[in-house]
UniProtKB/Swiss-Prot annotation:
Gene3D superfamilies: 3.30.590.20. Belongs to the glutamate--cysteine ligase type 2 family. YbdK subfamily. GO terms for biological process: modified amino acid biosynthetic process. This is Putative glutamate--cysteine ligase 2-2. One of its GO terms (molecular function) is glutamate-cysteine ligase activity. Keywords: ATP-binding, Ligase, Nucleotide-binding. ATP-dependent carboxylate-amine ligase which exhibits weak glutamate--cysteine ligase activity. Its EC number is 6.3.2.2. It is an enzyme of class 6 (ligase). Coiled coil: none annotated. It holds the Pfam family GCS2.
Length: 369
């Protein structure tokens, strides 16, 4: 059974005013110093600075079951909230700030170079995603997985969609984070590579163009991890509910296992161009699960419920083998019935027309057990 791990980028807000709080770097520093002073072990959790001061990232220890993943996410969010409290803040699972924000760059030489190169893109770039790492056996298997998961990543994005607001406005998108993130020139879907060598050649060609500063700026929707034997699926919004995060991560683990078995059996990767996948992802970003998604078998729009049923059917053998099918099906049904985080944010705003209510509602859901 493959291990899988989660990283969440979380928005840092003032515990009293609920406005974004530019103290992420200090919160991480104080968290680290507190553990060093007491000699306590953070238990495999890693809290690190992110691009802007109004956020930081939590990396959770890898797990093998959905149940353990859920408890890990809940504990990690509580740990992050404790770190935020050291600077008078809270952390909330919001991919974008609902209200207007001019974020503050973390003082870091690399980030400063990125800012100098990419200008206004950096000045507005405050987004929080969630990334899923799934264990792979070799570089060849890793790239084979990337080639085959591509067509399903818009569905993953739709399930996670949780960012309708940007700079104080309802964008009409379910995931505007994905739109904002795709301002980066290396972001988005990739074409089929075919081999690990071809993947490395593609990376080298992008880096030789002199636009991305380093391999860390190759922001593909899915990529081979530089530091661990994993593939990293990067398409999802950070989710309000820990249960949704755990289930989406579980779906991605099952997807990786399914396509790895297909590769081992000699089945070819679906040859859908990246330019077409961009449109599939755009639709997922625009509507989430509220309208039609693209059926990967036909390339045509179909009701979201039908596309999700097809996704679950495709993964059913692995989910059943791992004993996770029942919980996953129930959670996906809940998302279809109650909506993703985007619907819940809009409902919170509609009640009184106050963006601060979006944040307070999101805080309650983020830390609900």
């Amino acid at each position: 059974m493959r291990t899988f791990g989660v990283e969440e980028e979380l928005l840092l807000v003032d515990a009293v005013t609920f406005s974004p709080l530019p103290a992420g770097d200090r919160a991480v520093q104080l968290h680290t110093e507190a553990h060093e002073a007491t000699g306590t072990d953070p238990g495999g959790y890693e809290i690190t600075r992110e691009f802007q001061q109004e956020q930081f990232e939590v990396a959770y220890p890898p797990q093998t079951t959905l149940a353990d993943q859920l408890e890990t996410i809940r504990a990690g969010r509580a740990l992050a909230d404790t770190a935020a409290s050291r600077v008078g803040g809270r952390v909330v699972a919001l991919p974008t700030s609902p209200g207007p924000i001019s974020p503050h760059l973390v003082p870091n030489p690399r980030y400063q170079r990125i800012s100098e190169r990419f200008g206004f893109t950096v000045k507005e770039q405050l987004t929080c995603g969630f990334h899923i790492h799934v264990q792979v056996e070799s570089p060849a298997e890793a790239v084979a997985v990337l080639d085959r998961v591509r067509v399903w990543l818009p569905v993953v994005l739709a399930l996670s969609a949780n960012s309708p607001f940007w700079q104080g406005f309802d964008t009409d998108f379910a995931s505007y984070r994905y739109q904002a993130w795709n301002r980066w020139p290396t972001a988005g879907p990739t074409d089929v590579f075919g081999s690990a060598d071809a993947y490395e050649q593609h990376r080298a060609a992008l880096l030789s163009a002199g636009v991305p500063l380093d391999p860390g700026m190759l922001y593909f929707d899915a990529r081979v991890c530089e530091h661990h034997p994993t593939v990293e699926i990067r398409v999802a919004d950070v989710c309000l509910e820990a249960e949704h995060t755990a289930v989406i991560a579980t779906l991605v683990r099952a997807l990786v296992e399914t396509v790895a078995r297909e590769w081992a059996a000699g089945m070819p990767a679906p040859d859908v161009p990246a330019s077409v996948l961009q449109l599939w992802s755009w639709r997922a970003s625009r509507y989430g699960t509220e309208e039609e998604l693209i059926d990967q078998a036909t390339g045509q729009p179909a009701p979201a419920a039908e596309v999700l049923a097809g996704f679950l059917s495709y993964l059913r053998p692995v989910l059943s083998e791992y004993g996770e099918l029942e919980v996953v099906e129930a959670t996906v049904a809940d998302i279809l019935r109650e909506g993703t985080g985007a619907r819940r944010q809009r409902a919170a705003y509609a009640a009184r027309g106050r963006l601060v209510d979006v944040i307070t509602t999101a805080l309650d859901i983020t830390h609900r057990r």
